[in-house]
């Protein structure tokens, strides 16, 4: 079983895996539209973390992890708990960056618009302000944003995730202005 990471699963890998590959999935875009009251915010003052939204023609780069044989259910149970804040699972096709490896199915955690923590779209400036001000049990929301942006930039320098990098720029401007 393979699991696709497009948010904190890219840079905070706290579960065992057998192999990992950089690549992308299609027909989605990454957006900071999911609220976090359990990791990067608190009830009443949620942080914002990424989810995926359907986007015909879109693509999202990330990392696929092969779960260890015999431990798939154990690791999936852990990931179900870690991604408990309104995420459900689905299966999609993953396209490895290394084109000599054929595409294959991966498990995907996605926060849909009908979950209680879904915040949805907002002006980028408002999302940046919310990220700038939020913190929770797993740390500041700014750390989540910066770790994700740095990781995507290192893994896939050619990825021009405008939403991610625009938010990074806006939040850094707020930090410098403080």
UniProtKB/Swiss-Prot annotation:
Main localisation: cytoplasm
Known EC number: 4.3.2.7
Biological processes, Gene Ontology terms: glutathione catabolic process
Reactions performed catalytically: glutathione = L-cysteinylglycine + 5-oxo-L-proline
Record-linked Pfam families: ChaC (PF04752)
Catalytic residues (positions): 83 (proton acceptor)
Alphabetical list of SUPFAM superfamilies matching this protein: Gamma-glutamyl cyclotransferase-like (SSF110857)
Chain residues that bind substrate: 3-8
This protein's record includes keyword Cytoplasm: yes
Alphabetized InterPro entries for the sequence: ChaC, GGCT-like, GGCT-like_sf
Keywords from the named record: Cytoplasm, Lyase
GO cellular component terms, semicolon-separated: cytosol
Family: Belongs to the gamma-glutamylcyclotransferase family. ChaC subfamily.
Function, as annotated: Catalyzes the cleavage of glutathione into 5-oxo-L-proline and a Cys-Gly dipeptide. Acts specifically on glutathione, but not on other gamma-glutamyl peptides.
This protein's name: Putative glutathione-specific gamma-glutamylcyclotransferase 2
Organism: Mus musculus (Mouse)
